[in-house]
Amino acid sequence: IKTAADSNSRWRPVGLGVMGLQDAFFRLRYPFDSKEAQDLSKRIQEEIYFYALETSCELAEKYGPHTAFNDTRASDGMLQFDLWGVQPTDTARWNALKARIKTSGLRNSLLIAIAPTATIASIVGSYESIEPMVSTLFKRETLSGEFLQVNKYLIHELKQLGLWNDHI
């Protein structure tokens, strides 16, 4: 569709995100809603956002900013955390990047997305999205058929404790 192609050329959106966040929490034994899990999630998201912006800025320095850059808040030095009243961890690093973005622009208008989809998560063997796992045992229905999914971290723990058997 021409309008979609024109919009993509003008705004150049991409969607980078985190995959396996719940898996990391299981491995680290962090309850999903714990302070440790929240802090880790924040650090991961901040790093993804920082390096996505930095890379997009590098591409803008090489190829020019996306054509709608001057219409964005980023052109005024406003980034997502500014819009939500969130303080980044290393303000000096962020201030330097903001100044660079104001000077050079960004190659992409959108950088971050909530990922992955259920299908991609199943392919790579991780839990989907950034939400907590819905159940330790569930049936996934796809076009290829039905699949029983069991929490592999629970199985590992039960095996470690000598509690995993055919009856479970």
Residue map of PLM features:
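Long, C-terminal-biased catalytic regions of enzyme "large/alpha" subunits
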Residues: I1-I168
